[in-house]
Regions:
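Short hydrophobic alpha-helical segments enriched in small aliphatic residues
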Residues: 243-246, 265-267
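Cyclic-nucleotide recognition modules
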Residues: 56-119
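Polybasic "coupling" helices that flank or enter modular domains
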Residues: 101-170
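Cyclic nucleotide-binding regulatory domains
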Residues: 18-82
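Phosphate-/nucleic-acid-contacting segments
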Residues: 142-237, 269-272
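Short proline/glycine- and basic residue-enriched helix-capping loop/turn segments at helix->loop/beta transitions
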Residues: 2-24
Length: 272
């Protein structure tokens, strides 16, 4: 994977930081960026005392800077798993990594994070429970789409409480919704912290935000080719609405964000 090789190449040019699960670190200071080398992080905020909100989940290759995360009260980065990060000073990296590669990578990843913030606002502000959960699972699945693999394994190392917090629903509602997705053949449980997406097309149909999620996550081929300079070649053939590295255009048509029918009563089954 080109992004992974690029991250490895710059690891020796920055300060490495290793985190234990649930360890917290503050946002990087102005002028610094953090690149997640491996593991998963959560961006947390606590606008009021004792009320934590998960803003996003970060995976390997994601980039965080002070300019992409608002300095809300109590904001921090929390390791979901053991994680490795690299703290970079852009001018220092510029000396050894070609400028167009370096800036293309950072800008693409930072804009990707901002686009995800907008999608998250739509998810929790306008979608009912089932399309909200479907959108969350779809976003994770699209990161791992491969043309030769019809089924996709999605790792879920975060707790269900964290997922429910991110989606602004309660724990039991999340569990019931995931069980319904299992019952109708959309997904199946692979392990305690992983699911397998069985029918990606059907999952897309459950999410009114599928087109936006595809624009942000399914361009992984472009992201993988960033460091080899091939992204610019592919960009010319992409629809204009999907350009600018995943930035959501000012006016977006994502299908109706209508309220779904009343939630069916499902008994909790003690797991997904």
């Amino acid at each position: 994977m080109e992004v992974a090789r690029f991250v490895e190449a710059i690891c020796g040019k920055g300060d490495c930081l290793h985190l234990r699960p649930q360890q917290r670190v503050p946002l990087p200071p102005a002028g610094k960026v953090l690149v997640l080398r491996e593991g998963m992080l959560a961006i947390d905020a606590m606008p009021t005392k004792g009320k934590q909100q998960v803003l996003d989940f970060l995976v390997a290759g994601d980039v965080v800077s002070a300019s992409t995360v608002l300095p809300t009260p109590g904001v921090s980065l929390r390791a979901i798993t053991s994680a490795s990060l690299v703290s970079l000073d852009p001018p220092a990296v510029h000396q050894t990594v070609p400028a167009h590669d370096y800036w293309t990578f950072l800008i693409a990843q930072c804009l990707n994070l901002l686009a995800r913030v907008n999608i998250h606002q739509l998810m929790i502000g306008r979608l009912e429970t089932e399309p909200r959960v479907a959108s969350f699972v779809l976003g994770l699945a699209l990161r791992h789409v491969r043309e030769d693999t019809p089924e996709i394994t999605v790792e879920l190392p975060m707790s269900r409480t964290d997922i429910a917090n991110y989606l602004v629903i309660n724990y039991d509602t999340l569990s019931r919704t995931m069980m319904r997705f299992c019952d109708c053949g959309l997904i199946e449980r692979e392990s305690r912290h992983a699911i397998r997406v069985i029918d990606l097309d059907a999952l897309r149909k459950r999410s009114p935000l599928a087109a936006l999620l595809s624009a942000v996550f399914e361009k992984g081929g472009c992201r993988r080719e960033i460091s080899s300079g091939r992204c610019a070649e592919r960009k010319a053939s992409m629809p204009s609405g999907h350009e600018n590295h995943g930035v959501i255009p000012p006016v977006v048509t994502a299908g109706p964000l209508s309220r779904s029918s009343a939630e069916h009563a499902y008994a909790s089954r003690g797991g997904w």
